[in-house]
């Protein structure tokens, strides 16, 4: 049989990857002609994903994006999915390839992403995040924030940052490491990419955390910082987020530590964005705001330490 001729040309155009279609066929044990209604989802910051149907059931397939092979260790990602298996935390993963990063999951009808500006959405998602943290799951790899900043910078291959004060900003951010280490109380599996888009609220009100590719051992409070900076929260919104997570009581030292994480994670994702932009992927306002978090929250930390 000529496989190429048996596939809907629109499907090939939507996926732009025949290997992905062959993978779906093998995983679902279905003839490739039964893979229908393929259409791209909104392109993510790290990956490209698409919906498809097979015999009336919907699925999602992820294909890693530009330069992702340098950013994500797919074997470590697979180990995370093994660690969370049976915990009812994630969407249902039917297939994950630890080499090329292909992933197939079931599609949840009537599910929606968390709205970072809806208080009830944020509350239920932060409660679920805290429940995950309290499980204190373990894996064998870690996500070292400061080492990753250096790593992303190394991917620039000697080209300078687009920010003229980068060296000064980096030095200031790295000076926060001592305070962080002093108040780092927990160390467990942390999502790392716990942004609103990665919380699915199902029709029954339950919450699933998806896209665990950055997950690793870390201080779980990093996830609070990540949620805040992706949402582009101002300081008042950050404080409200912290209060929701801690149910109204967060010790001052821990709050300041989270401010530190916001500065550190801002620089981390700014460097990540600079790498992706060198590959032709533009983030514009988001990238600029991440760099500003590094600067602004360093200043906020200093003011809080003085008072």
Model-inferred region functions:
Residues 1-33, 295-307:
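Regulatory N- and C-terminal appendages and interdomain linkers associated
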Residues 66, 110, 207, 215-217, ...:
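Activation segment
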Residues 39-145, 161-167:
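ATP-binding pocket architecture of kinase catalytic cores
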Residues 13-32, 36-37, 137-192, 197, ...:
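An alpha-helical support segment within catalytic cores of ATP-dependent transferases
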Residues 123-124, 165-176, 241, 283-297:
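Extended, well-ordered alpha-helical scaffold segments
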Residues 221-250, 263-281, 293:
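Active-site activation/catalytic loop segments of kinase-like enzymes and analogous catalytic loops
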Residues 42-56, 60-61, 177-224:
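Active-site acidic catalytic loop and adjacent metal/ATP-binding pocket
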Residues 9, 271-307:
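ATP/Mg2+ or Mg2+-diphosphate-binding catalytic cores
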């Amino acid at each position: 049989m000529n496989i190429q001729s048996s596939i809907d040309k629109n499907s090939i155009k939507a996926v732009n990857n025949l290997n992905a279609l062959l993978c779906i066929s093998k995983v679902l044990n279905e003839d490739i002609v039964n893979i229908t209604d393929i259409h791209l989802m909104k392109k993510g910051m790290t990956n490209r994903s698409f919906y498809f149907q097979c015999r009336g059931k919907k699925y999602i397939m992820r294909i890693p994006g530009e330069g992702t092979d340098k950013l994500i260790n797919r074997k470590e990602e697979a180990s995370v999915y093994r660690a969370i298996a049976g915990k009812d935390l994630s969407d249902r993963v039917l297939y994950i390839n630890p080499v090329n990063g292909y992933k197939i999951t079931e599609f949840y009808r009537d599910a929606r992403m968390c709205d970072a500006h809806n208080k009830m959405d944020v509350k239920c998602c932060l409660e679920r995040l805290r429940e995950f943290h309290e499980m204190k799951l373990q894996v064998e790899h870690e996500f070292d924030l400061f080492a990753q900043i250096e790593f992303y910078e190394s991917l620039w291959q000697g080209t300078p940052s687009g920010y003229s004060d980068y060296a000064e900003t980096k030095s200031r951010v790295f000076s926060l490491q001592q305070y962080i280490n002093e108040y780092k109380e927990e160390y467990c599996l942390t999502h790392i990419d716990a942004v609103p888009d990665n919380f699915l609220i199902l029709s029954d009100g339950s919450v699933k955390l998806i896209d665990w590719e950055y997950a690793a051992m870390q201080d779980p409070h990093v996830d609070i910082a990540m949620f805040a900076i992706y949402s582009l929260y101002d300081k008042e919104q950050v404080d409200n987020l912290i209060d929701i997570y801690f149910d109204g009581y967060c010790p001052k030292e821990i709050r300041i530590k989270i401010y530190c994480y916001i500065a550190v994670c801002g620089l981390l994702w700014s460097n990540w964005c600079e790498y992706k932009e060198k590959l032709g992927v533009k983030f514009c306002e988001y990238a600029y705001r991440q760099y500003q978090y590094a600067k602004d929250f360093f200043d906020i930390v200093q003011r809080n330490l003085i008072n």
